[in-house]
Amino acid sequence: MDSFKTVLKFFTDQKTTIGYSVMAILTIGSERIFSMVSFQCPCTKGQNFPYGICFLLGPAVVLLVVGFFVSTRFWRLYTGCCLNPLKLCPRGNFVGCLKGLIKVLYGACVAPVMWLTVALLNGTFYECAVSGLDEVAVIQIFCADKGSVCQDELHRVPCGKSTLPPEQNTELLYMLRAQSQILGWSVIITAVVIALIGTCYKNCVSQVSYLQLTFWKIYMEKEREKFDAFANDYATKLADRNLKSFFDNKLPEEFPFPNHKAWEEISAIYNFRKSEQHYSTLQRYVERSDRDYSPDEHPMVEMDHGIEMV
């Protein structure tokens, strides 16, 4: 039993790493399925480029949209801002607003970057797309010293149907694949450098120590778990009370429940202040004596570490 708890705790502590690993495996598997089952390069000048680009960038765009859909931070920032724009940028705090949006974009870009990396390292989509370009620069790169036949047959190289000698066809295919893999590694290096710089900057400007930040993360995780449990329990009780009142044809019993303003406040992105020993908007709300509070009174300063409750 203790061993099971140890394993469970390990997976819980490493759930972010495990999540990214699973995402990477799914991305690689999806790319291989696309390449072997769905992708068939037309090998015509007019269709190679749009066809290859659609398979290269199309899934990345879809994954980006899905990333926004599943982003809790995005919906916390966006929900209700059309009716009340101050929710997004209270008191014109565009810096805090921009920080929040950048973090949303950062999280949403993980899956698309993984897809682009895997697709470029494989090279199939890139080979098809670039071979269909009728640009002088492309022709000069691939068909230098190979004559006009290479220019006319380049779009057929990915399919192996060109009239070029086999060794030239293989050489062109290797050149296309090498370019694709260079771009793939460039994407990886760029993403890693940006992630490193962002992490270093985030920790450098942190207003809390490392140990307090560790405690903060644990607290937010526990608060999130307890919130889900309490929400489920109270929703069940409220449903039971309403149904009992309906079927008994009696007035419902009094049921204490947070008002709209309370929900608005605890749903806001937390603003850290050194003068307050609070770790979430929920804690700040329950410990404040005066609860007639509007989130617009305080500018939104996005937490540097992006810890959030729900």
Curated annotation (Swiss-Prot):
GO terms for biological process: ATP export. The lineage of its organism: Eukaryota, Metazoa, Chordata, Craniata, Vertebrata. Keywords: Ion channel, Ion transport, Membrane, Transmembrane, Transmembrane helix, Transport. It is a multi-pass membrane protein. This is Calcium homeostasis modulator protein 5. It comes from Danio rerio. Belongs to the CALHM family. InterPro entries: CALHM (IPR029569). Pore-forming subunit of a voltage-gated ion channel. It is found in: Membrane. Its main location: membrane. The keyword Transmembrane helix applies. One of its GO terms (molecular function) is monoatomic cation channel activity. GO terms for cellular component: plasma membrane. The chain crosses the membrane at residues 17-37, 49-69, 101-121, 181-201.
